Amino acid sequence: MYKRQGLDDGSRLPVPIFTPTTKAPIGEHDEPMTIEQVQHVVGTQVAARIDVLARRILARGNEIASANGIIIADTKVEFGIDRTREDHTGGPLIVLADEVLTPDSSRFWPADQWQPGRAQPSFDKQYVRDWLTSSASGWDRASGEAPPPLPDEVVEATRARYMEAYERITGRTLP
């Protein structure tokens, strides 16, 4: 589909895309929702505010990350609604409900290595996903079995990627 639109793996989109999903039970994948489905669940005005909030969070994250050599390829932002409280619009309070802009919820790419048309090096959990789906793990996701424990070298390589993302974005090192 994207190839027909002139996009390759790793292509920069002209504008961010808002792709809402349901919250699935632990161990299952969230299911995509249409904007109409979101509007049906939370109402048109709340759906529009969630869209704006998600885009603002990504825009601010992109400002900080790009100034520090990181591309945020995508991110997940989870919201909840507190119907017992109102926000400044008089509607229900929308609450940021989970981590935001971390290597677990986003794909961070080094800008100096970005090259459309190929898989990108990353500072996120993709390394773990790649190992789990490799023959080295011996795991078949379709088996219904829990994934195997991660080898120390996979844990260390993942930790190093997360630390590099932190250090690039913040300009600080951790002891």
Predicted region positions:
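Short, small-residue-biased leader/transition segments that mark boundaries at the very start
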Residues: 1-2
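A short mid-domain helix/strand-loop element embedded in enzyme catalytic domains
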Residues: 10-44
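A long amphipathic alpha-helix within ATP-dependent nucleotide-binding catalytic cores
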Residues: 41-73
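Conserved metal-phosphate-binding beta-hairpin within the catalytic cores
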Residues: 72-98
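C-terminal helix-cap and adjacent tail motif
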Residues: 100-165, 169
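Charged phosphate-binding loop/patch that engages nucleotide di/tri-phosphates or the phosphate backbone
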Residues: 173-175
